[in-house]
Amino acid sequence: MTAESTRKASIERSTKETSIAVSVDLDGVGKFDITTGVGFFDHMLEQLSRHSLIDMRVMAKGDLHIDDHHTVEDTGIALGQAVAKALGERRGIVRYASLDLAMDDTLTGAAVDVSGRAFLVWNVNFTTAKIGTFDTELVREFFQAFAMNAGITLHINNHYGANNHHIAESTFKAVARVLRAALETDPRQKDAIPSTKGSLKG
C-alpha cells in the first residue's frame, strides 16, 4: 500500500458464522492478499482489486461446512465498511462513473454514485446454478452487501453473454473499473464535497 495515501481503512468483523479482517487503500496500485476459503470468490475479489487499483487484504474464515453464503455475504459487508471508512466525508472525489465492459462473449455495464445512499439495481441472469462449486446467486449477494455497507448506489446490467464464468467475472471487472473512476480525487474540486447539499452521508 502506498505510503502517501491517507484513504486507508481496516475492519474486523466476527460473528458465530464468520471471522473476517479487511484492509483497503483506495489510492493503491491493485495489490491484493485474499484468502476466503472459496476459490472462485478469491479469484473474483482479485479482479475487483486489480482493476479498481484498490489495494486489498481480505482474510476470511467461515462456516464453509454449511455452504459459502455467510462467507461471501459477510466479506461484502466488511469490504463495504472498509471502503466507507476509508472515504470519510468523501471530499474531492469524482463521485459518478459508468461503463460497458467486454469480456469475450459477454458485455456487462456498471454505473456507480458514491453518494452515501445505498442501493443496488441488479439485472444479471445466470443460466446455471453453479460455476464449479460456487453458487451463482452469491454474486448478487456479495454486491448487495458491498453496496449497502459502502454507501454507494450501484447498477449492474449484463447485456448478453453465453459463458457463466465470464458473466460473473465481467460484473466484478465492470464494478472495479467504475470504482476506480468514481473514487479518484478530482483536481478541480480537491477537498470539496461533490454535492449541492454539502454532504454525502446519505
Swiss-Prot record:
Keywords: Amino-acid biosynthesis, Cytoplasm, Histidine biosynthesis, Lyase. It catalyses: D-erythro-1-(imidazol-4-yl)glycerol 3-phosphate = 3-(imidazol-4-yl)-2-oxopropyl phosphate + H2O. It holds the Pfam family IGPD. It is found in: Cytoplasm. Its main location: cytoplasm. The keyword Cytoplasm applies. Its EC number is 4.2.1.19. The keyword Cytoplasm applies. Pathway: Amino-acid biosynthesis; L-histidine biosynthesis; L-histidine from 5-phospho-alpha-D-ribose 1-diphosphate: step 6/9. GO terms for biological process: L-histidine biosynthetic process. GO terms for cellular component: cytoplasm. Belongs to the imidazoleglycerol-phosphate dehydratase family. PANTHER family: IMIDAZOLEGLYCEROL-PHOSPHATE DEHYDRATASE, IMIDAZOLEGLYCEROL-PHOSPHATE DEHYDRATASE HIS7. This is Imidazoleglycerol-phosphate dehydratase. It comes from Brucella canis (strain ATCC 23365 / NCTC 10854 / RM-666). The gene is hisB.
